């Protein structure tokens, strides 16, 4: 299928396109792919017979800079991170926040948020995912030693202590996040933020495995070292060639994970991307299609071309202090 996402910003039209073969999966799975989240569980309609080989080869646009949720920056990294790691919340097919590791949540005056974690959420090594994992992850995210590109992301949620931590005035342990018990996480904000829970679909808020990081250091994301809590785990990584993920049997919703293996390719050329799809080498292209090919492909393979609106925001951060 080709997915064409038109983006109108500042009077400039942009297109994002990808292609996915319908013969691979049922409609529900296809919808999950179109949402950009392969890991999203799917309900296979009654009477639908899936293809015998449930594997997916997709272009990811470029080589990733990292698989560490606190070191990633771009869309290619986020695509894979969402398959490997699951945060408190995820996005559903319509882009709305939905339960992830947290099966429910509540708040007091939009300032103190409590997340109730699934008791069956596990890491790929079989150990349980706990509230302490999120405390460690969020503290690591804002730690200057981590140098995370998204260290300031939690500032949008106004988590207590974060401004002073990022300024080096307080230790990371003063961040307003606390494990009440293994399955209850409490987050205290410096002011009411009604939309706080919506921020938690971002990959940088996912838990990370403390034991693996402490054991392997910077090499913790390599095959054989990495421990994940999402629908997939890392099988193979050949830089500038491919990244292969395989279904994780310990994932809490594994029964509804349909695709057994996902291979990501770093194809930068949009023309090459389309050509390799049409030759049968890949099942799904990246988001960008050469605009000059859109009408031609829409005519030749209309069932494989899908058009979606693309929403994004451009903004400037002005330093008005100096």
Describe every region a protein language model picked out.
Residues 92, 246-250, 310-322:
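A bilobed periplasmic-binding-protein/Venus flytrap-type ligand-binding module shared by bacterial periplasmic
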Residues 96, 163, 168, 172-174, ...:
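Gly/Pro-rich hinge or "lid" segments in bacterial periplasmic/extracellular proteins
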Residues 62-78, 101, 149, 196-206, ...:
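A structural "hinge/loop" feature
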Residues 43-44, 294-307:
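Ligand-binding "clamshell"
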Residues 59-109, 139, 225-228:
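N-terminal lobe/hinge region of extracytoplasmic solute-binding protein
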Residues 52-63, 103, 112-115, 134-137, ...:
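Short, well-ordered beta-strand elements
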Residues 103-150, 186, 276:
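Aromatic- and charge-enriched surface segment that lines or borders ligand/interaction sites
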Residues 217-223, 249-296, 311:
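Ligand-site clamp/hinge motif
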């Amino acid at each position: 299928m080709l997915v064409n996402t038109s983006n109108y910003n500042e009077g400039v039209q942009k297109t994002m396109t990808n292609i996915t073969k319908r013969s691979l999966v049922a409609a529900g799975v296809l919808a999950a792919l179109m949402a950009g989240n392969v890991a999203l569980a799917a309900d296979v309609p009654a009477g639908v017979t899936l293809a015998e080989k449930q594997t997916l080869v997709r272009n990811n646009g470029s080589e990733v800079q990292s698989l560490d949720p606190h070191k990633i920056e771009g869309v290619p990294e986020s695509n894979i991170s969402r398959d490997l790691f699951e945060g408190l919340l995820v996005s559903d097919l319509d882009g709305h926040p939905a339960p992830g590791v947290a099966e429910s949540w509540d708040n007091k005056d939009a300032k103190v948020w409590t997340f109730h974690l699934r008791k069956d959420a596990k890491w790929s090594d079989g150990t349980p995912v706990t509230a302490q994992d999120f405390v460690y992850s969020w503290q690591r995210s804002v730690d200057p030693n981590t140098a995370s590109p998204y260290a300031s992301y939690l500032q949008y949620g106004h988590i207590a202590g974060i401004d002073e931590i990022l300024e080096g005035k307080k230790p990371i342990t003063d961040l307003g996040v606390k494990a009440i018990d293994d399955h209850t996480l409490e987050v205290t904000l410096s002011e009411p933020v009604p939309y706080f829970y919506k921020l938690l679909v971002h990959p940088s808020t996912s838990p990370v495995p403390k034991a693996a990081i402490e054991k392997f250091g910077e090499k913790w994301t390599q095959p054989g070292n990495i421990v994940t809590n999402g629908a997939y785990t890392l099988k193979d990584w050949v830089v500038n060639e491919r990244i292969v993920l395989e279904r994780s049997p310990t994932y809490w919703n594994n029964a509804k994970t349909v695709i057994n293996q996902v291979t990501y390719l770093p194809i930068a050329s949009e023309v090459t991307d389309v050509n390799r799809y049409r030759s049968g080498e890949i099942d799904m292209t990246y988001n960008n299609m050469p605009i000059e090919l859109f009408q031609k492909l829409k005519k030749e393979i209309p069932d494989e071309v899908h058009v979606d609106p693309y929403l994004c925001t451009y903004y400037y951060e002005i330093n008005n202090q100096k």
